[in-house]
Amino acid sequence: MTMRKRIAFLAGAISFDNQNRVLGGVLKRASELDMDVYVFTCFVNYDESEENKVGAFRIIDLPEFDLFDGVICMKNSIQYEPAVNSLIARIKKSKVPAVSVDEKVDGMYNVGISDYSSQKDIVEHLIETHDLKKINYVCGILQGKEGRERYNAYRDAMEEHGIPVCDNQIYHGNYNRESGRKAVEQFMKYNMPQAIVCANDAMAIGAMERLQQNGYRIPEDVIVTGFDNDELSEFFVPSLTTVDRRQELLGKNAVNLLFERSDDVNVQIDTKTIYRESCGCNMQPAMEIKDLRMEYQNKCLIYEEALIH
């Protein structure tokens, strides 16, 4: 009897929609190929204390990689440098084929997207289509590739259009909804911008929540955009302009790279910018649809808060 091939999948903050969707793609493709997937992850958030991160990320010390036929690692999601460094060293030492999702790692296959061009498309859309100039930005974690590239894209788009950016137009967040809420509180101390561009959907939704609580209309008073195309982005009121990273396809391609042994060690997946109501595009939903979306949105927010706490 032939033994089924085994894949180790490693990621942090699995409660985030991005990691879940990539894992979904991995599981679907592995099932099609009659392979087993062993998942090593935790529910740690990016803003956890050092002590909590040390404990939570011990989970990624468990797998003996020599026992697997391939490894898929979401390095960007493990926001604790000692754990990341130890993990990468152990994977390389094992000599087992490995794929890094999103961030390139020497000696591994890589599947990812262009965070830079995807984020730049949104900023340029606001400048060129909506004729905006005062555009603020809510960063992700700049130590990671995706946070750094998205921030650089915002700065470059503004500079190329001759639009200056002040320090008080930037808020340094950590990908959760609370970062979006706090960003709005900071921006309210100054003149409110025409638009707030966020490095992910969770922060964008947090920003929209706080704006609405303070009487701002979206997009009439302030435009908001996100990144990731999380499930809630489509159903929030107003629906969120965002970038579809096609995470499930990333996961499927990660499995393919492990076993097809392609000469191209770096595979880039095309993203899709989705223009919705939060930037003023594609308005006019029927009122009953809005009511249903609001009900769904509230249920999702309650569920996500329960996961966090």
Task: State the predicted function of each range.
Residues I88-A89, D106-Y137, E149-E159, N176-E185, ...:
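Hydrophobic alpha-helical segments within soluble ligand-binding/sensing domains
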Residues D69-G70, K133, Q194-A195:
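Conserved acidic residues
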Residues A30-S49, K134-Y137, R155-E178:
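Short beta-strand elements in bilobed, periplasmic/extracellular small-molecule ligand-binding domains
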Residues F65, M283-H309:
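Intrinsically disordered, low-complexity acidic/proline-/asparagine-rich linker or regulatory tail/stalk regions
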Residues L33, A183-Q284:
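Flexible loop/turn connectors
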Residues M1-E124, F187-M188, A202, H309:
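Alpha-helical recognition/docking segments in bacterial nutrient-uptake
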Residues I78, Q143, R150, A202-A204:
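Alpha-helix capping/helix-boundary segments
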